[in-house]
Curated annotation (Swiss-Prot):
Natural source organism: Chlorobium luteolum (strain DSM 273 / BCRC 81028 / 2530)
Compartments, record wording: Cytoplasm
Protein's name according to its UniProt entry: Ribosome-binding factor A
InterPro entries: KH_dom-like_a/b, RbfA, RbfA_dom_sf
PANTHER family according to UniProt: RIBOSOME-BINDING FACTOR A, CHLOROPLASTIC-RELATED (PTHR33515:SF1)
Amino acid sequence: MSRRTEKVASLLQQELGAILEKEYPRGGPLLTVVDVKVTADLGLARAYVSIIGSEEQRTAAMEFLRDETKNIRHILSTRIRHQFRRIPELEFFEDRLFEQANRIEELLRSVRKDDGDNA
């Protein structure tokens, strides 16, 4: 990734995080924009979102993001329009790394416990 795309991705990550903090309904799952990947032509930004909540909440959150993509892009354009000629199209993807890390920690704890019982 070039320095330009890295800077754009970083700015989009910050701004999308702030937008989601204000726009996403309270009382739902915790949404965090963990990464943004931008194409070389800056025409498309893929935002990876970590969602902490139940399976139903995660599904609802992804539906919300996909349904509101156009509105989120519009809000984004009002916030950063002086820095870009064209605002990239947005795509949202769920990042389950946090969930996978918790599962690995649980497995490691159970292995340590089993080793302690067998000693």
